[in-house]
Amino acid sequence: MNTARLNQGTPLLLNAVSKHYAENIVLNQLDLHIPAGQFVAVVGRSGGGKSTLLRLLAGLETPTAGDVLAGTTPLAEIQEDTRMMFQDARLLPWKSVIDNVGLGLKGQWRDAARRALAAVGLENRAGEWPAALSGGQKQRVALARALIHRPGLLLLDEPLGALDALTRLEMQDLIVSLWQEHGFTVLLVTHDVSEAVAMADRVLLIEEGKIGLDLTVDIPRPRRLGSVRLAELEAEVLQRVMQRGESETRLRKQG
């Protein structure tokens, strides 16, 4: 793709957002502001509300209470500017790679699809079937499918969780480089704290349906694996997660 930015990043504002499932409170009056173009990672224990937050932003769920805004506009009104990637690339096996990238598009989209594939290093695989691709290559196709829509907001729900270590690092670098080039806003949900710290400007820890930790990652890019500062920030987040886990264990024993 060319070096022009695809779109201006979407600014996000969540005001007192709650999400309940019957008696289960997953998000509890959560307040959050994400400036346009920021890369944010969300971590936390399973069941803490990370994926629910992503689903609200993707328009797959509606909040029980509160407002989800893109600046001053309800995010639901500009949902076409939002794209989401999952751990499973969700490619249609009966369609070629390029047809998966252009899925749902009308008109003359093939040139744009080829540019999107070139941006993720798969320009020579356009005519192949998904079955011929590795797991990492399938995720590159999913990323190209997101890029062709010129997103203002890219939501990543553990998209690298099933990849081997080396492929995962390559995909991390690719996502960060495309974000730097095009300026969209990114929200990454991950269980991997080292991944969160390595990729994001900011790491959020969700606890009891609210933001329990909001950590700025003030490390210049490109970031070097093995950096002492990266290790310190990772340890800070992990310590907070573990403290919370120990508190919950004590409460269960007392109960």
Curated annotation (Swiss-Prot):
Residues 12-233 form the ABC transporter domain. Belongs to the ABC transporter superfamily. Aliphatic sulfonates importer (TC 3.A.1.17.2) family. This is Aliphatic sulfonates import ATP-binding protein SsuB. Part of the ABC transporter complex SsuABC involved in aliphatic sulfonates import. Responsible for energy coupling to the transport system. Its main location: membrane. Pfam families: ABC_tran. GO terms for molecular function: ABC-type alkanesulfonate transporter transporter activity; ATP binding; ATP hydrolysis activity. Gene3D superfamilies: P-loop containing nucleotide triphosphate hydrolases. It comes from Escherichia coli (strain K12).
